């Protein structure tokens, strides 16, 4: 068959669908073989020749498993020994002429102008109407229809890998498709015929117990257990078990995206990806959790969600041993150990380990405060800040210190307080080695070393390292004296001044 002559694989008919009631016979290797002349063989590159070899051998193996190929042909022997399997040009053309149908306008068209292709077409129904009308395929019990050849004109343009690959893929696919419709050739006894029509599956996988109605399906399935991947991508070297999967994969390299979304125009390389994408527009969520009823667009998302109910946490951090339900959660967690901060604020250049933290930080620049307190109307940038604030109104203080019995609104505040009892000072200054009980105190202290004074008095321009120092200083300008002595009623600007004054009344200064 001259696959080299394909102008467009979509113009080539499906051989199995060209059968008429009176044209059925037994399948032989010749009916599904693909042949090239010496001139055509030279046009194939190494990847195309390898693909050709794999398809021919697979077709022969399939027919042999069905009892339809009793001995190896000369061509198969050539392929196994890696010899060039081309035929003379006249033999390629005339080998299938008696069974063919013609694309030429006249039946007398010269054989030299045509080539046997016997492959399939993506436009099946159109071709059927041209040649066979709309007769349905009628199967005679116990017989396998012959794949008929169809002639098309030779093309002048060079072979393209995609055309040859699709043609060869189709050659193999037609044979498998035909066997699926007709059953195996070995319906020799009434018992086996009855078993086939009854839908029985006699071919059982010894590994997993799965049963199949046809032997070739079992052979294909067993590749899963054997890990056998015989089809290699010439672009990246990736291996596949089935040629159909290789063909689908090659779209990645060609960049072809034939499936377009009618709603937004986005294109996809596979129809399955388009179907999944369209759920964004339709809102369809066909995958429902049997535990909680939550629905998802993708089955993979449902599978991940199930881990919440099962408690399965297969992903373990090698640094601290913490377990996670999802690999993505583990990867985010590991940034704590690596210090990686891939998310950068475009306004101030600050980096964050998680995108969610960057989004929260971004509100500092935009001024957005989407969370409102229903009690006092105050707005907050984060939901967690609102929840903490609401405890002010409820008076809730659920966190208790076991040492002194004091209560706190937040657990973080309790943890900081407990350092008063334990004396823990986990925060060390790298400059001078001084330790602090709180991170905020360390940050304030570090300004001593770097000389940073970010807080400026608007009245006199004086700079301060801490905001609290600025607040105290501003009382000089405002005259505010918020601290009152309960003994004599005198007021003071600073709490420290009041503390010293009280010694007069207690007699400590004497």
UniProtKB/Swiss-Prot annotation:
CDD domains: KRAB_A-box (cd07765). GO terms for cellular component: nucleus. PROSITE patterns: KRAB, ZINC_FINGER_C2H2_1, ZINC_FINGER_C2H2_2. A zinc finger (C2H2-type) spans 203-225, 231-253, 259-281, 287-309, 315-337, 343-365, 371-393, 399-421, 427-449, 455-477, 483-505. GO terms for molecular function: DNA-binding transcription factor activity, RNA polymerase II-specific; RNA polymerase II cis-regulatory region sequence-specific DNA binding; zinc ion binding. Coiled coil: none annotated. Residues 27-98 form the KRAB domain. SMART domains: KRAB, ZnF_C2H2. Keywords: DNA-binding, Isopeptide bond, Metal-binding, Nucleus, Repeat, Transcription, Transcription regulation, Ubl conjugation, Zinc, Zinc-finger. InterPro entries: KRAB, KRAB_dom_sf, Znf_C2H2_sf, Znf_C2H2_type. GO terms for biological process: regulation of transcription by RNA polymerase II. There is a cross-link at residues 166, 176 (Glycyl lysine isopeptide (Lys-Gly) (interchain with G-Cter in SUMO2)). May be involved in transcriptional regulation. Belongs to the krueppel C2H2-type zinc-finger protein family. This is Zinc finger protein 419.
